[in-house]
């Protein structure tokens, strides 16, 4: 019988010094981020200031009260060909094939008169919402949560900047609430007695979602207390422990692209667990026109740099490649 693999080491980092601590405390946090992202690729952010109980309450209420008719009317194009949207909307369960459901929404600043909305720029969509009389607190909460978790992500990026040997405001100009392409996804995994078929990894592990790299700058995830994630390490696949009210943070592919893979996106996957749970990732993105110059932190000097690329083009190509590899979520 094989020996069970030990869980991956995922440190918990108090990020509060990044919001006003002294230089030494900020440097210490940056060193902890650096170590985590160079080892397992994940860390938990504590003292983040977000009310996660309210987050759970609102998301559970939303998934509990959505009707089948509402889900279809708001479904993205992959599920409802009458809807041209490919990002914002409902991602439906498919009877006998797929049980997980989710709602994705984008920047509340993307109003009808936003320049990128008016021009029809790819990856930009003004949000649609479920009936606001039936779901009275959903839209106001979601829009405020977007602003809150975007602000949290900008704080985290100060730590990443310092970890990379840059000034703490290095990423600030690339992260504007007016044009960020960041997305929130509210994923609900149900418990079902007759669960539809699931995928199987090469090692025989039953999976809800196969191995992948997140397409983002960083991903900031809140999840309920059901262990499900695994990260690929030199020793094989290891479980990522859960951590109560803390947010799980990892680098996305753009961070690897930008830093010459000094901070690579960790390869991870979702185990099949037949238990009701929530997985609520925030994918941090720059704006469409943002162009950052890739660079080499100390350990990667001598390697050829990636060419600069407009962020919106990078996001579109990488997102399409992920869907082609792993299928529509």
UniProtKB/Swiss-Prot annotation:
Pathway entry: Antibiotic biosynthesis; penicillin G biosynthesis; penicillin G from L-alpha-aminoadipate and L-cysteine and L-valine: step 2/3
Catalytic activity, per the record?
N-[(5S)-5-amino-5-carboxypentanoyl]-L-cysteinyl-D-valine + O2 = isopenicillin N + 2 H2O
Q: Name one Pfam family in it.
A: 2OG-FeII_Oxy
- In this chain the Fe2OG dioxygenase domain maps to 180-286
For this protein, the record's PANTHER family field holds: 2-OXOGLUTARATE (2OG) AND FE(II)-DEPENDENT OXYGENASE SUPERFAMILY PROTEIN-RELATED
Family statement: Belongs to the iron/ascorbate-dependent oxidoreductase family.
This one is known as Isopenicillin N synthase
EC number of this enzyme: 1.21.3.1
PROSITE patterns (alphabetical): FE2OG_OXY, IPNS_1, IPNS_2
Name the keywords, alphabetized: Antibiotic biosynthesis, Iron, Metal-binding, Oxidoreductase, Vitamin C
What task does this protein carry out?
A: Removes, in the presence of oxygen, 4 hydrogen atoms from delta-L-(alpha-aminoadipyl)-L-cysteinyl-D-valine (ACV) to form the azetidinone and thiazolidine rings of isopenicillin.
Q: Where does Fe(2+) bind?
A: 212, 214, 268
Q: Which residues bind 2-oxoglutarate?
A: 277
The protein's required cofactor(s) are namely: Fe cation; L-ascorbate
What's an example Gene Ontology biological process for this entry? antibiotic biosynthetic process
Detail which positions bind N-[(5S)-5-amino-5-carboxypentanoyl]-L-cysteinyl-D-valine: 87, 91, 189, 212, 214, 279
Listed GO molecular functions?
iron ion binding; isopenicillin-N synthase activity; L-ascorbic acid binding
Positions binding isopenicillin N in this chain are 87, 91, 189, 279
